[in-house]
């Protein structure tokens, strides 16, 4: 009950903040590390038409970006920064963008639905998603043999306890659980930083599905693109609940899932399988 009440209160505060913040300068404060990470996507896609650092600083564009950044997600803020550093002078593209902004301004309810999805996707602290996406795609898939072995060890210990020797079986169960937890944290520590990016990619894809499910009429062209991408990458979001959500709410379900992950390594198995999928779908 307490968790449900706190989550509802948190959602109400988010909605209030989104409504009050529309059309107003962002009040968010940035650390030097956070701001540096935001610029990485632009630096990886810089071209001859980009605004150079001297001109950018002379125009005070850092302050402009900070005031505009109500994106509420890592991918959104990195792309906004890139848009400002690589201005598009094509009149048709600008008219299209202006119409999109006007449509959202006129449709407060639909706008709020989209904003809530962006908040749900969220920001990854102190890292650049674009950096880690490139790293994750280049990772080599690790074997899941040890993870499956830890599950079999626990299963064998339980069967031994129930059918052969309860006393000895209990000690085997303790040993199996200890082995599973120790190996879990050992392997999890090695890939923990990549988990953040993988979770974010999964949430981006799930967010795309949520946006298309809203069926907003003036987003027809974008919905078609998102649907195509979601279909091509649908295997990535399957059984995504096995991964950590990143939203630690203290709920009983999340606590039980944490224990399940430690004992069965299902999130590590899912992670290794996702690495192969990312490499296969690198073009997307």
Language-model regions: role of each:
Residues 1-284:
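Alpha-helical bundle segments enriched in helix-capping/polar residues
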């Amino acid at each position: 009950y307490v968790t449900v009440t706190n989550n509802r209160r948190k959602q109400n505060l988010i909605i209030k903040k989104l409504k009050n913040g529309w059309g107003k300068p962002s009040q968010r404060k940035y650390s030097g590390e956070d701001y540096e990470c935001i610029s990485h996507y632009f630096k990886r896609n810089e071209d001859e038409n980009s605004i150079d650092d001297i001109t950018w600083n002379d125009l005070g564009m850092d302050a402009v970006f900070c005031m505009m950044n109500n994106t509420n997600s890592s991918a959104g803020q990195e792309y906004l920064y890139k848009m400002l550093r690589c201005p598009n002078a094509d009149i048709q593209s600008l008219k299209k963008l202006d119409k999109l902004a006007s449509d959202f301004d006129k449709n407060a309810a639909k706008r709020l639905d989209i904003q809530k999805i962006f908040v749900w996707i969220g920001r990854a602290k102190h890292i650049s998603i674009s950096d880690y996406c490139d790293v994750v795609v280049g990772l080599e898939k690790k074997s899941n043999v040890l993870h499956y072995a830890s599950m079999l060890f626990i299963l064998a210990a339980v069967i031994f306890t129930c059918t052969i020797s309860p006393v000895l079986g209990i000690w085997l169960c303790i040993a199996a659980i200890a082995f599973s937890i120790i190996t879990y944290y050992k392997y999890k520590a090695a890939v923990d930083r990549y988990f953040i990016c993988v979770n974010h990619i999964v949430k981006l894809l799930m967010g795309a599905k949520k946006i298309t499910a809203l069926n907003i009429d003036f987003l027809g062209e974008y919905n078609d693109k998102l649907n195509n991408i979601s279909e091509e990458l649908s295997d990535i979001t399957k059984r995504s609940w096995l991964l950590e959500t990143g939203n630690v709410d203290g709920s009983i379900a999340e606590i039980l899932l944490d224990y399940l992950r430690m004992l069965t390594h299902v999130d590590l198995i899912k992670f290794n399988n996702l690495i192969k999928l990312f490499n296969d779908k690198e073009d997307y």
